[in-house]
Amino acid sequence: MFKIGLDRTSRSVVFALLAEALFLAGCGGGGNNTSAPPVTTPQAATPAFSVSAGSYTTLQSVALSDSTGGASIYYTTDGTTPSTSSTLYAAPIPLAATTTLEALATASGYNNSSVAMAKYTIQLPAAPAIPTLSDIHQGFIYQIVTDRFFNGDTSNDNPPESAGLFDPNGFTNPTDWHLYWGGDLAGIEQKMSYLKSMGVAAIWISPPVDDIRVNAGSSNGETGYHGYWPRDMMQIDEHFGDSANSWAAFDNLVTAAHADGIRVIADFVANHTNPIGAGEDGSLYNNGTLVTTYSTDTGAAPYYHHTPNISNYEDRYQLQYYTLESLADLDQTNPWVDQYLKGAMVHLLNHGVDGFRLDAIKDVNWGWEYSAENAIANWSGSPSLPAATARPFLFGEWMEGSGDPLYPDSVKFSNQSGINLLDYTLYYQLADVFGSNKSFTEIDNELTLEDAGASSGTAQAFAQPNDLVTFFDNHDNARIMTLGADQMGVKQAMSFLLTCRGVPTLYYGDEQYLHNDTGGGTDPYNRNAMTSFGANDATLLIQYLAALRAANPAVAFGTMQQRWINDDVYIYERKLGNNVVLVAINKNKSTDQSITGLDTYLPPGSYSDYLAQTMGGTAIVVTGAVGSNNPVTAFRLPHRSVSIWVSTGSVGPSIGSITPRAANPGATVTVSGAGFGAAAGTLSFTSGSSTIAAAAALWSDGKITAVVPAIAAGAATVTVTQGTQTSNAAPFLVNTSVLLPVNFSVSGLPALSATDVVMLSGSVAELGNWATSFNGAIGPVTLPPTGGGLLTVSVPAGAAVQFKFLVLHGDGSVTWEHGANHSATIPASGVGNVAVVWQN
């Protein structure tokens, strides 16, 4: 038809004419065509923004709308052009930082709209200055997985003694989440100014000691990047320090942290070494010298328990004597292992750590852990080390929900050992509420259960709830953004956590909205590479909250009371003396809440939002006489908001925390709180009818350091008197003397019902002083499948004791064994062993 020899423009004209001719022919001809013209598809209306572009000094919430019926709106906030793959609009968009918002509308039967764009310059007020912290309760802990935080020294990325375990793309595009990625102690040191800017009180670093040096898994790699597969607890891992496994990088980190007023908490593993039958086969070294492997551990006094994997995590015997996930399970009551583990903790203390997070304490021998706490309580240390005066802070991991069978055991363990717990029971509710949008009543019910107080006599109540370590994300569970929280949800969770009772812990990267949802976001995908260290709306919020914790003792040490609640709204109050902080959170994404009937301890007056509306908060007016139920004038609590109202006032002597909570006479303790006065008053210990004043080595308005006086062992209280005012009586457990672990075994037990437990009680406080209740007696005794009973108890070294076993029945009644009391003399050192037969 055509000869193709035209230029590009000419060809376009010819083809257009040809197309028109073919169209006319298909319509039945030329000028006589009477068919309708082609239909033109209309374009959807351009989206409208509820807030005009411009500069603002408060947080803005922008609603999007479109006049096209049934339109869907997609938007971006990162400067990219929106498409149908962008975020689908569902609720007003909170803006707390300068943002360019772009939106596109789509609708069935319409072409996509034009893109609407608006730039919002948000210049929020600077956060208040953060005062110097005298106690960890006044700030928050920042948890770091060292390998995933920052690479500060590339020379240790692929060390020769453990070559081939490094992914060079880990921080950019990881190929293997089980390899080392390069984060190290030098990297944390180099980011100290970032941590200080947020008001971090302490960093909790993953175990820094030497881990296995070979692949312990299949070809895809299994390494100890996380720190929980130790081989030598006396050396620093070469990936975190240097090839000499020296302490230089660790010491540098501690020095830098202390210079910025930040404490260092080391994660410590006492339960196990490393995988059995793979890698290094449960290798155990002592400062470079091989002690044993799992397979060669065949002596008369084995270092390990050679037992099956735990199959029932609510079985007391399995937990303490079986194997956790094929990791070589240390026998803490082997005398060498006992001294090795305690020596490793003292070694870390001598290198400047300020406390420990104890891994898997539910799976370690419970009775031995009492003696480990006592060893740390009796550590004297160098006066140049902060932990020598502000005593080491201990907390441990016991995964248990309040509805689980061993929850009462966990409460008893914490109350009587002096080891604080990670508040896992509260965590489960926080993950539900902020991650899965469940009702706030879950949190409130949990707090009511846990915080009933030691005087309640219930097996559910913690003696010192303000010592529990709280969190909503960690390295073992999916981050709440994976569970469903958006950025505002994370900030609301932060707001709750940092104003709730307890010592709050933020997981690294939460402030940068870090998450990876692969595999449900659990291990290892919750151990992401830290991608940013910049300031944003979340770091600003943290600064506000850190300043509040530091400045107002009600948040660090006060009581906590629910004031108003429904599924989406939680209003609660912290109080210490005349210091009051009232917090209101509305997590509903679209509905404001009318608040009526709210009472408060805040004095009458008008209160602006402490957060300066950076979380969409509002002001309130309090009326009535000063008291516990001052009415708040009805007000509207905005959706997706957090409001905080603060009153700062006087406070008499008030004890918030004692560290440690259990110690023997002669040990040093730190009493923290407020209102102690600048001049020394009187610090008193009361046990039974006896009250003895303690000699204070340090006295300030918020902290006292003193030596436990010679006083009767057992449950005691501590008070501070300043002038005519005396503080609350804080619970304290006085140990008789230095403790060591003793294995008590009993054979010939009577037949037991499903609700029976075997307990031990005896002649000293550490054996229960002949008490018979669940909380008073010692135990329950573990029941090996081979028969009999086994229980490790930490008792006074060198003591002569008497004791008996008893059966505590489900109805509270007791059956003692018959006959005379058993007698034993406890050795002066090491580990004791006492075996008896049940007396019928």
Each model region followed by its residue ranges:
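Substrate-binding/active-site clefts of carbohydrate-active enzymes
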Residues: 133-140, 147-351, 371-384, 389-407, ...
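Active-site-proximal helices and loops of the catalytic beta/alpha 8
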Residues: 253-262, 272, 343-350, 354-464, ...
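Aromatic-rich carbohydrate-binding modules that target alpha-glucans
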Residues: 81-87, 750-800, 808-827
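Bacterial Sec-dependent N-terminal signal peptides
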Residues: 2, 15-46, 124-126, 130
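Surface-exposed, short loops/turns at beta-strand junctions within beta-sandwich domains
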Residues: 93-99, 710-714, 796-799
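Beta-strand/beta-sandwich contexts
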Residues: 649-680, 725-737
